[in-house]
């Protein structure tokens, strides 16, 4: 290699295979401001609204809607969801949607419904997001899961 090539190589950042970069630890500014008592109270209210009232079935129910209902802002809500549930808002909704879908896919009363209809019943806006969330949570496709239980 020439001296010019060596200098260029020294100046350029080290390239990792497949453009992988070191994952940086994210620290949300709001997390340090969360009072544990308020976070616990919000946790209970979030569970009530999302799970008990089954708002997860509404494909248009956003974090903004939930924050408005809880009379807080979306950043604080997001920080509470992340700290108390260990996931972001959309993953939280998708987890409950997938659990509901698992039940409906194996329920004989819904045997006449196709996967797309079931995905709409549990609150997914489209089939692709349903398949992606289902596979992420269960480890197999909705059709594969259903076949396993219908045999």
Where do the PLM segments sit?
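Key DNA-contact positions within bacterial/archaeal DNA-binding proteins
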Residues: 75, 127-128
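Long cytosolic C-terminal regulatory regions of eukaryotic multi-pass membrane proteins
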Residues: 109, 148-151
């Amino acid at each position: 290699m020439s001296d010019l090539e060596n200098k260029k190589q020294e100046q350029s950042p080290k390239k990792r295979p497949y453009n992988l970069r070191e994952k940086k630890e994210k620290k949300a500014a709001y997390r340090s401001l969360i009072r544990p008592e308020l976070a616990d109270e919000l946790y209970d209210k979030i569970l009530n609204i999302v799970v008990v009232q089954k708002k997860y079935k509404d494909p248009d129910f956003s974090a903004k809607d939930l924050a408005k209902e809880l009379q807080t802002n979306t950043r604080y809500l997001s920080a509470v969801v992340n700290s108390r549930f260990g996931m972001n808002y959309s993953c939280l909704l998708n987890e409950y949607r997938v659990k509901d879908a698992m039940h409906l896919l194996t329920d004989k009363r819904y045997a006449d419904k196709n996967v797309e209809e079931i995905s709409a019943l549990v609150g997914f806006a489209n089939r692709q997001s349903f398949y992606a969330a289902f596979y992420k949570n269960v480890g197999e496709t909705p059709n594969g899961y259903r076949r396993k239980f219908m045999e």
